């Protein structure tokens, strides 16, 4: 069974195509004319004028090293960022969820590597920019919270997925037609004309076919064991510790537990709470949501 799972992950890895470009001027020109929407010590994400998302990463030290690939596939951790981010996005695509950005391909141009993600459209902007353009209503804020929590809960149940860095710039907001959306066991809920899309998986980890996929160089001392490394409550607390998400909402007492934790930048687990999409529904605020005609 282990060998079968290994083959499944290896097949995923082969789908991570690296396209080499000899002329780098055009790639850099696109990025220069785009907008930097997020950055860190390992790279930066740009939104191009036509809506495409591109992440420019620092040169991975061993992108083509067979030993590194083997360790990654065996569940011993990946050393390079691009390989893992491509794998994470490829795995999450199996959820067929509109709330996770899709992976396209990796470009290599000289010493630099670029992850091309799907075209979300020029009107899709980071949450931090979105809240500067308008005052969110209770119902809009609640719709954003529910979509985030539902998507994370689904990904964690299926793949033990943890994003690891859910700050406002890693959450894109797209204006869409207002309609009722189907959310599994929760039924149909009004989306308030907003779609949430999660991006940037530089700190992410998950399990695919039982094999843990994670990076070895991202402060391994944060986690004492796999239970902590794949504790999904870290993401939930990261969201509910952000006043921009929960302003004026009294959704669950669990939120206050998160807010009083004094979380670090990457929300290191474990946390003694388990906030789910059901907790949000119990607020009864969704009972008041109707589509105005």
Task: Tell where the protein language model's regions lie, with residue ranges.
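C-lobe/activation-segment region of protein kinase-like
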Residues: 187-279
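Catalytic-loop of the protein kinase fold
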Residues: 156-174, 179-188
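ATP-binding glycine-rich phosphate-binding loop
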Residues: 18-51
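Conserved structural core of kinase catalytic domains
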Residues: 78, 99-139
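Conserved kinase catalytic-core helix
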Residues: 133-164, 168-169
């Amino acid at each position: 069974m282990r060998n079968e799972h290994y083959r499944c992950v290896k097949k995923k890895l082969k789908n991570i195509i690296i396209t080499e470009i000899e002329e780098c001027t055009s790639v850099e020109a696109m990025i220069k004319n785009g907008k930097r929407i997020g950055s860190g010590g390992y790279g930066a994400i740009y939104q191009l004028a036509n809506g495409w998302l591109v992440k420019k990463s620092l040169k991975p030290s061993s992108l083509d090293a067979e030993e590194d690939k083997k360790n990654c596939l065996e569940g011993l951790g990946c050393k390079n960022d691009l390989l893992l981010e491509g794998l994470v996005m490829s795995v999450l695509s199996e959820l067929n969820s509109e709330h996770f950005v899709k992976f396209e391909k990796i470009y290599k141009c000289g010493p630099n590597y670029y992850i091309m993600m799907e075209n979300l459209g020029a009107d899709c902007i980071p949450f931090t920019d979105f809240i500067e353009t308008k005052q969110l209503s209770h119902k809009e804020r609640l719709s954003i919270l529910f979509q985030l929590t539902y998507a994370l809960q689904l990904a964690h149940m299926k793949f033990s997925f943890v994003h690891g860095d859910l700050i406002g710039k890693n959450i894109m907001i797209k204006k869409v037609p207002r309609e009722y959306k189907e959310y599994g066991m929760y039924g149909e809920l009004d989306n308030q004309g907003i779609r949430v899309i999660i991006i940037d998986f530089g700190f992410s980890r998950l399990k695919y076919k039982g094999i843990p996929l994670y990076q070895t160089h991202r402060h391994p001392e944060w986690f004492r064991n796999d239970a902590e490394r794949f504790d999904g409550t870290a993401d939930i607390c990261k969201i509910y510790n952000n006043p921009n998400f929960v302003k004026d909402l009294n959704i669950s007492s669990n939120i206050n537990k998160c807010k009083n934790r004094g979380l670090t930048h990457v929300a290191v687990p474990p946390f003694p709470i388990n906030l789910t999409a059901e907790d949000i529904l119990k607020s009864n605020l969704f009972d008041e949501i109707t589509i105005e005609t």
